[in-house]
Amino acid sequence: MTLNCSLTRMATLGFFNTRRVHNPILRLHSSQPLSEKIFLLLLLDLYFLIDNDYNLPQMLKNTRGSAFLINTKRPPKDTLIPGIIFVVIYAVWAALVSSGSQFIHNFDNTVIKIVCNTNPANVAFAKDFTNLGNTSTITIETIILFIILLVFKQYAYAWFTAGVMICANGYNWIIKHAVMRHRPTIKHLVYADGYSFPSGHSVGSAALFGILIILTILLVKSKFWKTLLIIIWALFPILIGYTRIFVHVHYPSDVLGGWIEGITFVLLGYSFLYHFYIEPKMLEMKRKQ
């Protein structure tokens, strides 16, 4: 993998600037939380992994309109049925939470005893990492990803990203005001307002990093890097959810509900993308061969 300038020079400049004509600038400011810097660096790595396989600038010069990029002979099949299953699971979980089920009460108490402690190192980590799931941060991260996909002329993938994120977060707002569950009464370690179920941080992170998992499967050729990135993307929402419980602003059932909702919209969104874009393009490629 060849970079256009040394990492030392890029660090000195204070931002990463890839090929200037085609690529967006990802700025890393000293005031940014460590978690955000890690995310941007990983996103940059994803770009270079894709660029290494395709020579994107040259390819995009020779492409009119949308460029169909896919780096796997067997993309994930239609996810409609798993999506419907997750819809049912989410509906049952939301019903249990809204009814004040004893099962949910026991579940929350059990997980809280395991997760919460007052270790200063854990508190510092949780306060920093939880910022990665803030609404403003998730919005910025989504916009960055959306712009990168537009620059690549991946219009279908870009609108898949935007559609999933808008629907997931919009539906989250509706459910919050339908269930109206109050947050834990224990002292919060970070500021949080609004209703508790489902966790907006968990919804947003599960949706965004679920999208990144899909894009990594579709676009990254190397099995090693594909596997590594998928593991890393999966860890982000898990850790964000953990921090929301740790800083006392959500019950574990809020976090689990958020994960389920986010994954549901990724599965349903990919089903739409597969039927109306990937499958037709794959068939078109086979006919040309």
Predicted regions and their residues:
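Aromatic-anchored segments of alpha-helical transmembrane domains
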Residues: 91-93, 168-172, 235-244
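Membrane-embedded catalytic cores of phosphoryl/pyrophosphoryl-handling enzymes
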Residues: 64, 72-76, 188-289
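Membrane-interface loops
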Residues: 105, 142, 154-222
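Alpha-helical transmembrane segments of integral membrane proteins
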Residues: 78-85, 156-164, 225-232
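Hydrophobic alpha-helical transmembrane segments
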Residues: 133-150, 216
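N-terminal transmembrane-helix/juxtamembrane module of multi-pass inner/ER membrane proteins
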Residues: 57-137, 177-179, 183-189
